[in-house]
């Protein structure tokens, strides 16, 4: 009986080949879903950013209270004839803003503010429609990457909540003798818009690379830079809230000087609340401070200084990374912060002229996204190559 010769290296040379690692579910993408979902998210990102800008213009033109009803579906159709315009104008005439601020307004003037508010709401409907069509389309076609439907569903849920908060905010300006919405409700509304925009941006960044690429990149995660961007996100979010409080009571127009505030560092009466005794233990006093122009404007300036100072310090650390893309992200962020300082000062000195004020708000959106971009690259660095010249 012949004896079969065996190689002493048989286990290594002739054994079963190890399976080749496969990409994750999002890599397979079920027919390119990853790319499609990313494009869909980018469309939503542009729409939400436009929504924030239009919302700012609606506020700056005092148009937000021109529509006194909340009709999510039927409100999509504007007045189409003279009778409908007259009926709509009559509803506005019952509002405190008309009686106390716009008495005698002409139909043409009313139509001008009406179209701003209608456009703002209509854009919200478009965002909801784009989200619903995209989400249901990917879901029904079974092209939704495994594990992604909850986070994409969350965008729609938050969008619906945002619509309700928008009406809750508007309703506050239709009561009593108010001629504007409550600044605290405006702050909630704007803050949620930034949260939604940030969620969309983060998911789109994740979809820019495969799961395998993200897994490899995560091995070189730069924890210190990631922690620094976390601090920046917290401070930037606080600054957004404070900016909304300033805008809600037009606090920027009362102190058109810089770096001082009408000749002093601490504005006069910044701790004064009408009708409430100054008492650190009194919640009414604390809430009243949010309606004090000097107090909220001072905090907004200080938070801005803190954000820029931290951003520039963290930029120094970001420049030390070996990853070129990460260095570039911190460079862009530092430049945006400096530009935002200039816009902020310009907004103050112009007493919040709408052109400068809206540019300042757009700057806040840009900074928010750039922080998220730097954070993403700190968590998932893009590995450079000497051969490709990307190191």
From Swiss-Prot:
One of its GO terms (molecular function) is oxidoreductase activity, acting on NAD(P)H, heme protein as acceptor. One of its GO terms (cellular component) is plasma membrane. It comes from the Bacteria. It catalyses: Fe(II)-heme o + 2 A + H2O = Fe(II)-heme a + 2 AH2. Its EC number is 1.17.99.9. It is a multi-pass membrane protein. It is an enzyme of class 1 (oxidoreductase). Pathway: Porphyrin-containing compound metabolism; heme A biosynthesis; heme A from heme O: step 1/1. Its main location: membrane. GO terms for biological process: heme A biosynthetic process. It is found in: Cell membrane. Heme binds at residues 300, 360. InterPro entries: COX15/CtaA_fam (IPR003780), HemA_synt_rhodobact (IPR054616), HemeA_Synthase_type2 (IPR023754). Pfam families: COX15-CtaA (PF02628). Keywords: Cell membrane, Heme biosynthesis, Iron, Membrane, Metal-binding, Oxidoreductase, Plasmid, Transmembrane, Transmembrane helix. Its cofactor is heme b. The chain crosses the membrane at residues 37-57, 121-141, 152-172, 186-206, 229-249, 298-318, 332-352, 354-374. PANTHER family: CYTOCHROME C OXIDASE ASSEMBLY PROTEIN COX15, CYTOCHROME C OXIDASE ASSEMBLY PROTEIN COX15 HOMOLOG. Catalyzes the conversion of heme O to heme A by two successive hydroxylations of the methyl group at C8. The first hydroxylation forms heme I, the second hydroxylation results in an unstable dihydroxymethyl group, which spontaneously dehydrates, resulting in the formyl group of heme A. Interacts with CtaB. Belongs to the COX15/CtaA family. Type 2 subfamily. This is Heme A synthase. The gene is ctaA.
